[in-house]
Design a protein with these regions (language model features):
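N-terminal signal peptide c-region/cleavage motif recognized by signal peptidases
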Residues: 17-20
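Cleaved targeting-peptide boundary
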Residues: 23-31
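N-terminal export leaders
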Residues: 3-7, 11
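Gly/Pro-enriched, hydrophobic low-complexity segments
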Residues: 122-126, 132-201
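Extracytoplasmic
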Residues: 43-45, 59-61, 67-69, 79, ...
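Short, solvent-exposed helix-to-loop capping segments enriched in aromatics
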Residues: 40, 108-122
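An acidic-aromatic
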Residues: 63-113, 176-177, 182
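A short, Trp-centered hydrophobic/proline-enriched beta-strand micro-motif
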Residues: 38-55
Length: 201
């Protein structure tokens, strides 16, 4: 089995089936959004593994580290040379091979919805749709103040509630899917993980 086939299989195991879409927010939706918001607000830090499918179909894997509010780090395994760090204000995208760094405002990415200090999906008017399948829920949200910045779809296992995957559609319409595994929540993380440093040439 090749590495690429293994990664594809790992991601497929976490991908979710087709969901029926709720026509409008129901009482069940409101309760679930409150439950999801409470779950996310209960996460101070998280670490684990990820498998990513880029907009071009390229598969990558690595480790991620998250500290709310506003901080996340993706360490990609070779051959992907990327390192992505959000420091609460900016997202730094490193190319470790070329030793370059690009910065974009965190607020211009849909990930800010997941990383904000306090999540309130029921009352922020951010949720576009809620979808359900046996044992799974999928919530698609946008920033209501910046609707053109794209969307994030968060996929949760139910009972117990756990974030398993997110799908980001950026403002160019490009889709990136990230599936999570072996997560640990509320662990001690080095603050330096979330420091954007100019690359040394």
């Amino acid at each position: 089995m090749t590495r690429r086939i293994f990664l594809a299989g790992a991601l497929a195991a976490l991908l979710v089936p087709a969901f029926p879409v709720a026509a409008q927010m129901s009482g069940e939706d409101a309760r679930d959004l409150t439950r999801i918001s409470n779950y996310l607000n209960g996460i101070t830090t998280m670490e684990g593994n990820f498998v990513q499918v880029g907009h071009d179909g390229e598969l990558s894997e690595g480790q991620f580290y998250l500290r709310r509010p506003g901080r996340i780090r993706f360490e990609y395994k070779p051959p992907n040379p990327a390192l992505v760090v959000a420091d609460g204000t900016w997202v730094g995208v490193y190319d470790t091979r070329l030793k370059t760094l690009d910065r974009i405002p965190l607020g211009s990415t849909p990930l800010e919805i997941l990383l904000k200090k306090r999540v309130d999906l029921k009352n922020e008017h951010a949720v576009q749709k809620i979808e359900r399948a046996p044992g799974l829920m999928r919530v698609t949200a946008i920033d209501p103040d910046e609707p053109d910045q794209g969307s994030i779809t968060m996929v949760f296992a139910d009972n117990p509630l756990e974030l398993r995957q997110w799908i980001v559609v950026d403002k160019q319409g490009l889709t990136t899917t990230v599936a999570l595994s072996e997560m640990r929540s509320n662990v001690d993380l080095d603050p330096n993980l979330f420091f954007i440093e100019e690359p040394k040439r």
